Amino acid sequence: MKEIKSPFLRTIYEYGLITVSIWIMVVGIYFFKFPNHFAFGGITGFSTVVSQLTHWSASDFTSVTNTALLLLGFLFLGKGFGLKTVYATMVMSVSLSLLERFCPLSAPLTSQPLLELMFAIFLPAVGTAILFNIGASSGGTDIIAMILKKYSSMNIGTVLMLVDIASVVASYFIFGVETGLFSTIGLAAKSLVIDYVIENINLCKCFNIICDDPKPICDFIINGLNRSATVYHAEGAFTHHDKTVIMTTMKRSQALKLRNYIKRVEPTAFMLISNSSEIIGKGFLAN
């Protein structure tokens, strides 16, 4: 994430992102996941199963459970409990409750469960990836993970996976084999989609440029793209001619400009361009 110098503006920016990401998740959960009884994905997956066995709706049970987990978080984690997680959990609970009251659904939006499964996977995954990228979470089973991490030596990933698997297995018996199979696909695809979205959110281009005259290229990087670079001297293994290597990293939109500029002013330059989704330092991810 780009650095924002003002603490106030940075806070506004981050909480704005949290709000948008939660709304994206809520749309996927409420309009696509709950009506089709897709029972994967932590608390919302568990709520889908519980709603079929009790008088609770999936939205109401999710809201109540998230609120209870918030209280447990304050009780067991105290000051270590993140405000971003509290805010995200409250926004999700309120949003689901409002949709339940003002936009009730009695059936899926379409007759294509596979299409709706794609949205039930993709939208929450995008929201989760955005939250993860700014160091927040949507609460739910994440709060359980925080408590387990503090008070036990249990493998948190295994515990959370078992919760997801239990919900999916229950869906076979409660909703039928077809819904159970869809839930299994959703569980398998969820993590892959989250990882893919996170990588693409942070994707940058890394340049290693070998050239004879570094000055115009460095000037363009600094003045034209507002980036910096590291320059070091090298020697060609075959020609033994002196060469200069320029190493720099930038966003994809800037990378295209730099590549075109180098082709125009230094056509003999050798460029090695690679992707990176985790660059830590000034101008990129915070330490």
Where do the protein language model's features map onto the residues?
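Peripheral (non-transmembrane) domains and long loops of multi-pass membrane proteins
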Residues: 1-5, 201-287
